[in-house]
């Protein structure tokens, strides 16, 4: 409780004339962590994609465009304008859910030379940091009133042994969705952080 009260005090100072606050530092750490994860996601995806034949790339991309990511079930802003209109707490809550949805699937991410075994722990660290920011911005609001939405079904065929073609498709889907979701979280946290500085231009 003392930690939450302290963080609430810190975040309230974010609108004052002080150039840097502890609240902003917490946001900076979270943004830095998700930027790193987004870079890892991009590297994993592009290294995997470059290992495919041109026709395989074309077919998988076509299938992915017709498919959807599990995390699409998490209600989030549909465009940059809605993102900019969303409250800090809403952006943090969506980010938390997106990060949490990848803690288990990230363990099976493959491709390239990126440190795959470190992804899940880094997601857990990021989730913990976002939770601190949520607690600091709650102001008495219930954390996740629609908690049932947090329970997402596993990715299709996630627990099954697959043939070569289906395994290729699942890997492509996981990497593409992971990259997409880390980009979302990076955007949401960056906008939320910007809101702490009233003079800042938070245009996407």
Curated annotation (Swiss-Prot):
Disulfide bonds join 69-177, 194-202. InterPro entries: 4_helix_cytokine-like_core, Somatotropin, Somatotropin/Prolactin, Somatotropin_CS. GO terms for molecular function: growth hormone activity; growth hormone receptor binding; metal ion binding. The keyword Kinase does not apply. The modification Pyrrolidone carboxylic acid is found at residue 18. It holds the Pfam family Hormone_1. Keywords: Disulfide bond, Hormone, Metal-binding, Pyrrolidone carboxylic acid, Secreted, Signal, Zinc. Residues 1-17 form the signal peptide. Zn(2+) binds at residues 36, 186. Its main location: secreted. Belongs to the somatotropin/prolactin family. This is Somatotropin. The lineage of its organism: Eukaryota, Metazoa, Chordata, Craniata, Vertebrata.
